[in-house]
From Swiss-Prot:
GO terms for cellular component: extracellular region. It comes from Lithobates pipiens (Northern leopard frog). Pfam families: Antimicrobial_1. It comes from the Eukaryota. It is found in: Secreted. Belongs to the frog skin active peptide (FSAP) family. Brevinin subfamily. Expressed by the skin glands. The keyword Transferase does not apply. This is Brevinin-1Pd. GO terms for biological process: defense response to bacterium; defense response to fungus; killing of cells of another organism. Antibacterial activity against Gram-positive bacterium S.aureus and Gram-negative bacterium E.coli. Has activity against C.albicans. Disulfide bonds join C18-C24. InterPro entries: Antimicrobial_frog_1 (IPR012520). Keywords: Amphibian defense peptide, Antibiotic, Antimicrobial, Disulfide bond, Fungicide, Secreted.
Amino acid sequence: FLPIIASVAANVFSKIFCAISKKC
């Protein structure tokens, strides 16, 4: 498991959550 993958996954999840909750 690479820290880079975790960072990218967290970034993607944040964008998705932002879009869904509309709390950017």
